[in-house]
């Protein structure tokens, strides 16, 4: 039997090329994910450092200064210390729920970064339902907190978990009509389309000016979703010791703090995308995207400028959130629920009704 070696070599080279294509495709899929995870880690470290420095400035004291220049490595030092601490488990608690609770909270928040555009087409998943996917994913995190509180077999932890669930439900509902209003104005629920819709009219086309009521409700609701002061009822130190975190130690305790700062960064980025024009910085008479060619340039420089503008706006919102922490006193639980159900929800629904009416009359 004579075998045609030419055909055999052609078949082998074809299979090799196909396998190489699969390998290259996998590599190109993993590289953006790795870069995003690295950027998120660096962003969280910067947020922790900023919060400590701003808090020290507000309280007129010296902040962290020993770990690295200006104390910039303090968060890394704290994380390393928590990593080597003993992982204690409650003797009569549900160990399974106790162990997976922090992981669910962190993973649910990490998935939200899939639909956040950091630049022109610089997004992992440009979905047609991007903003609603974020709302759906963010509702998973309180389940992890409730599991942690229940699995701890501690009354303070359980109360903290119940408060976290109640607070999340109370403030996700007013937040959703605000996002619906933005989708109506942009004729899309894709985060990339929402940014591009704002870029059509320059600086005054930002949804901040077109939706001031929605922006205010979204800002308050996002602070409550992040459980930041004055909405940190689930872990009120004076009442619940540390809430659902009471029985935790070591790396699991650190995961809750990572989840908190990740959630704060997600909220800041969504405020930037929905209301502040995303990667576009359109100053009157000076269009930065046109000046640098952000929307046309596909190179590294254009992407870098877009990422820088997005993060600059997000960190401005972070500065406001951190300052609010040391400005307003903590609310009572009844005040918190009344604010969400009796004030923010009717206002957000009224804003949605007005937006719908204007869109219908403008057709």
UniProtKB/Swiss-Prot annotation:
Keywords: Chloroplast, Membrane, NAD, NADP, Plastid, Plastoquinone, Quinone, Thylakoid, Translocase, Transmembrane, Transmembrane helix. The chain crosses the membrane at residues 27-47, 104-124, 127-147, 248-268, 300-320, 343-363. It comes from the Eukaryota. One of its GO terms (molecular function) is quinone binding. PROSITE patterns: COMPLEX1_ND1_1, COMPLEX1_ND1_2. The keyword Acetylation does not apply. It is found in: Plastid, Chloroplast thylakoid membrane. It catalyses: a plastoquinone + NADH + (n+1) H(+)(in) = a plastoquinol + NAD(+) + n H(+)(out); a plastoquinone + NADPH + (n+1) H(+)(in) = a plastoquinol + NADP(+) + n H(+)(out). This is NAD(P)H-quinone oxidoreductase subunit 1, chloroplastic. Its EC number is 7.1.1.-. InterPro entries: NADH_UbQ_OxRdtase_su1/FPO, NADH_UbQ_OxRdtase_su1_CS. Belongs to the complex I subunit 1 family. It is a multi-pass membrane protein. It comes from Ranunculus macranthus (Large buttercup). One of its GO terms (biological process) is aerobic respiration. Pfam families: NADHdh (PF00146). GO terms for cellular component: chloroplast thylakoid membrane. NDH shuttles electrons from NAD(P)H:plastoquinone, via FMN and iron-sulfur (Fe-S) centers, to quinones in the photosynthetic chain and possibly in a chloroplast respiratory chain. The immediate electron acceptor for the enzyme in this species is believed to be plastoquinone. Couples the redox reaction to proton translocation, and thus conserves the redox energy in a proton gradient. NDH is composed of at least 16 different subunits, 5 of which are encoded in the nucleus.
């Amino acid at each position: 039997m004579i075998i045609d070696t030419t055909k055999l070599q052609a078949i082998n080279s074809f299979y090799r090329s196909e396998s190489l294509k699969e390998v290259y495709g996998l590599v190109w899929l993993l590289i953006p994910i790795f870069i995003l995870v690295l950027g998120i880690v660096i962003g969280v470290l910067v947020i922790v450092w900023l919060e400590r420095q701003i808090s020290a400035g507000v309280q007129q004291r010296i902040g962290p200064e020993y770990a690295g220049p200006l104390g910039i490595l303090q968060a890394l030092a704290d994380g390393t210390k928590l990593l080597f601490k003993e992982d204690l488990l409650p003797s009569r608690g549900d160990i399974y729920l106790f162990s997976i609770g922090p992981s669910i909270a962190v993973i649910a928040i990490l998935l939200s970064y899939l639909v956040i555009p950091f630049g022109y087409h610089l997004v992992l998943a440009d979905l047609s339902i991007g903003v609603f996917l974020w709302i759906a994913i963010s509702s998973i995190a309180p389940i992890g907190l409730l599991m942690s509180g229940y699995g701890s077999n501690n009354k303070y932890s359980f109360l903290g978990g119940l408060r976290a669930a109640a607070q999340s439900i109370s403030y996700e509902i007013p937040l959703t009509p605000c996002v619906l209003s933005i989708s109506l104005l942009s004729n899309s629920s894709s985060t990339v389309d929402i940014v591009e819709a704002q870029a059509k009219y320059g600086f005054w086309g930002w949804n901040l000016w077109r939706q001031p009521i929605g922006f205010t409700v979204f800002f308050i609701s996002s602070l409550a979703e992040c459980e930041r002061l004055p909405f940190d009822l689930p872990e009120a130190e004076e009442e619940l010791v540390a809430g659902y975190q009471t029985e935790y130690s070591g790396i699991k305790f650190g995961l809750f703090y990572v989840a908190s700062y990740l959630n704060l960064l997600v909220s800041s980025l969504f405020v930037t995308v929905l209301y502040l024009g995303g990667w576009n910085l359109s100053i009157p008479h000076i269009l930065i995207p046109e000046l640098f060619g952000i929307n046309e340039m596909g190179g590294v420089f254009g992407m870098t400028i877009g990422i820088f503008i997005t993060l600059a706006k997000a960190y401005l919102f972070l500065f406001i959130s951190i300052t609010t922490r040391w400005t307003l006193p903590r609310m009572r639980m009844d005040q918190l629920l009344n604010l969400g159900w009796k004030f923010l929800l009717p206002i957000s629904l009224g804003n949605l009704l007005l937006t719908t009416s204007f869109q219908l009359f403008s057709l």
